[in-house]
Amino acid sequence: ETEPLYGNLLTGKSYTVNYTMGWTGDIFDENDVLGADKTTFGLTNGKRGNNASYTPWCSFGIVEGKDLEFIVHLDKPTQVSKVIFGSLFNPAMRILPAEGVAVEVSADGKQYTRIAEKALKHDYPETGRIAFTDSIEFEPAQATFLKVKIKNGGTLRNGVNFEKNNGPEIIPAELWIDEIEAY
């Protein structure tokens, strides 16, 4: 289910994240060498991820208490009123969908103002693999810098939700995010 990305303010924009990416999902066409395009990576390349493929998903191993922060410089003051992103459910691979999202705007990239936040609820089975799409809408705001903070989906139990390993009994779920869009 791919909506046209026209009007998406973030397409092709470079961004920063506060975590190192595992899978970087940076692919422009099927023949592109994964990792070849360093400018936009997988979160603003106009490609939606799906259940069946690990591209163009971007994976983040989350540390408890530290939300994923995604920051885009929009070049000039731009009106924003909606953010959309995808996240993946696949507990066997230690992945849960996002549990919350917050949006902050800034004129200078230093002082940010939080303009919206939302808790996200997903119905999912014990096992399997599902791609969820979430959105958050808010009063139109001016942003030169847009920050999207995404909360991971909680914790998973070693040997219960995923195959037992020597790691800790309870781990923070990884976040696999796809195509953050703003309108």
Please annotate each region the language model reported.
Residues P4-R48:
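Predominantly extracellular/luminal regions of secreted and cell-surface proteins
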Residues T20-F28, H122-A131:
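Short, surface-exposed linear segments at secondary-structure transitions and domain or protein termini
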Residues E1-Y6, R48-A116, I130-Y183:
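Aromatic, loop-rich ligand-recognition surfaces of beta-strand-rich domains
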Residues R114-Y124:
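Solvent-exposed serine/threonine-rich low-complexity stretches and specific carbohydrate-binding patches
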